[in-house]
């Protein structure tokens, strides 16, 4: 009986480790070869004067995730207790942004979709109230090949792409200040209620150009429900279809071929 109890304890411990050790964050974004610093949650919260970056700032939460049950709270907007980045990067409408994830590699068991949204700040993003942001989807890639469980997913492509993801800013978006919301949803535990892991990350952008499109968006806490078919799902079966969570991408959205980005310079985030 002691052996059985020990085995049960070890299984519980391993399950806990699996659920708590797989975490991640975006260290930097790259625009036309220029790298802009994000927010480093393992070190920046402890610095009396952390560098200005373009990534939204959070306490050190063990690089953890947002649960589906928290999808109706402001934790889902840009992660738990997130506050606006103190700087922004400038990008032209139509340009691509490479988003670099840490740790390298992203856990290969954490299969799931990769999603990208924009929300206009209607003013300075550095001082925006996150609850006022309304997001529209510019990219959403989910299951690529489900013939052999657990399947080949967007995050698997991200791993093969240098642990990063390429997204294009729609060419006809109206210029202005925007928050880019980028997210991986890990589905390895999603067969159980509240088992999916959501990793939202946000960045301040100044988009330039002559576009006129102003797509309608929705507040972050209205993007998902814990029982959405793309969030509550058993991926350890043959899947012929997968419904990517969230709203439909806007008509101007462009899915780009994934490729890594060569960094040629370090950019200085622009403060207010």
Swiss-Prot record:
<dbReference type="Pfam" id="PF03443">
    <property type="entry name" value="AA9"/>
</dbReference>
<keyword id="KW-0479">Metal-binding</keyword>
<keyword id="KW-0964">Secreted</keyword>
<dbReference type="InterPro" id="IPR005103">
    <property type="entry name" value="AA9_LPMO"/>
</dbReference>
<feature type="signal peptide">
    <location>
        <begin position="1"/>
        <end position="22"/>
    </location>
</feature>
<feature type="glycosylation site" description="N-linked (GlcNAc...) asparagine">
    <location>
        <position position="60"/>
    </location>
</feature>
<keyword id="KW-0503">Monooxygenase</keyword>
<keyword id="KW-0560">Oxidoreductase</keyword>
<feature type="binding site">
    <location>
        <position position="197"/>
    </location>
    <ligand>
        <name>O2</name>
    </ligand>
</feature>
<comment type="similarity">
    <text>Belongs to the polysaccharide monooxygenase AA9 family.</text>
</comment>
<dbReference type="InterPro" id="IPR049892">
    <property type="entry name" value="AA9"/>
</dbReference>
<feature type="binding site">
    <location>
        <position position="188"/>
    </location>
    <ligand>
        <name>O2</name>
    </ligand>
</feature>
<keyword id="KW-0732">Signal</keyword>
<feature type="disulfide bond">
    <location>
        <begin position="78"/>
        <end position="202"/>
    </location>
</feature>
<keyword id="KW-0119">Carbohydrate metabolism</keyword>
<protein>
    <recommendedName>
        <fullName>AA9 family lytic polysaccharide monooxygenase G</fullName>
        <ecNumber>1.14.99.56</ecNumber>
    </recommendedName>
</protein>
<dbReference type="GO" id="GO:0030245">
    <property type="term" value="P:cellulose catabolic process"/>
</dbReference>
<keyword id="KW-0624">Polysaccharide degradation</keyword>
<comment type="function">
    <text>Lytic polysaccharide monooxygenase (LPMO) that depolymerizes crystalline and amorphous polysaccharides via the oxidation of scissile alpha- or beta-(1-4)-glycosidic bonds, yielding C1 or C4 oxidation products. Catalysis by LPMOs requires the reduction of the active-site copper from Cu(II) to Cu(I) by a reducing agent and H(2)O(2) or O(2) as a cosubstrate. Acts preferentially on crystalline regions of cellulose such as highly crystalline algae cellulose.</text>
</comment>
<keyword id="KW-1015">Disulfide bond</keyword>
<keyword id="KW-0325">Glycoprotein</keyword>
<feature type="binding site">
    <location>
        <position position="23"/>
    </location>
    <ligand>
        <name>Cu(2+)</name>
    </ligand>
</feature>
<keyword id="KW-0186">Copper</keyword>
<dbReference type="GO" id="GO:0004497">
    <property type="term" value="F:monooxygenase activity"/>
</dbReference>
<dbReference type="GO" id="GO:0046872">
    <property type="term" value="F:metal ion binding"/>
</dbReference>
<feature type="binding site">
    <location>
        <position position="110"/>
    </location>
    <ligand>
        <name>Cu(2+)</name>
    </ligand>
</feature>
<feature type="disulfide bond">
    <location>
        <begin position="121"/>
        <end position="125"/>
    </location>
</feature>
<keyword id="KW-0136">Cellulose degradation</keyword>
<dbReference type="GO" id="GO:0005576">
    <property type="term" value="C:extracellular region"/>
</dbReference>
<feature type="binding site">
    <location>
        <position position="199"/>
    </location>
    <ligand>
        <name>Cu(2+)</name>
    </ligand>
</feature>
């Amino acid at each position: 009986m002691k052996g059985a109890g020990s085995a049960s304890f070890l299984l519980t411990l391993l399950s806990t480790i699996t659920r708590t050790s797989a975490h991640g964050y975006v260290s930097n974004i790259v625009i036309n070869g220029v790298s802009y610093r994000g927010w480093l949650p393992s070190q920046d919260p402890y610095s009396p004067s952390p560098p200005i970056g373009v990534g939204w700032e959070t306490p050190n939460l063990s690089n953890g995730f947002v649960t589906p049950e928290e999808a109706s709270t402001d934790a889902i907007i840009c992660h738990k207790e997130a506050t606006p980045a103190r700087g922004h990067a400038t990008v032209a409408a139509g340009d691509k942004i490479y988003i670099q994830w840490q740790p390298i590699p992203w856990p290969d068991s954490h299969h799931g979709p990769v999603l990208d949204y924009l929300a206009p700040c209607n003013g300075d993003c550095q001082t925006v109230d996150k609850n006022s942001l309304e997001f529209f989807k510019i990219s959403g890639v989910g299951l690529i090949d489900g013939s052999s469980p657990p399947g080949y997913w967007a995050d698997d492509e991200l791993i093969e792409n240098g642990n990063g993801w390429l997204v294009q800013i729609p060419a006809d978006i109206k210029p202005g200040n925007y928050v880019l919301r980028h997210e991986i949803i890990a589905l390895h535990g999603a067969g159980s209620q509240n088992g999916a892991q959501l990793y939202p990350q946000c960045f301040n952008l100044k988009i330039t150009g002559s576009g006129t499109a102003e797509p309608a968006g929705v507040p972050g806490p209205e993007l998902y429900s814990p029982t959405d078919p793309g969030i509550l799902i058993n991926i350890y079966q043959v899947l012929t279809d997968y419904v990517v969570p969230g709203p439909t991408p806007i008509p101007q959205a462009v899915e780009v071929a994934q490729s890594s980005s060569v960094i040629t310079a370090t950019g200085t985030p622009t403060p207010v």
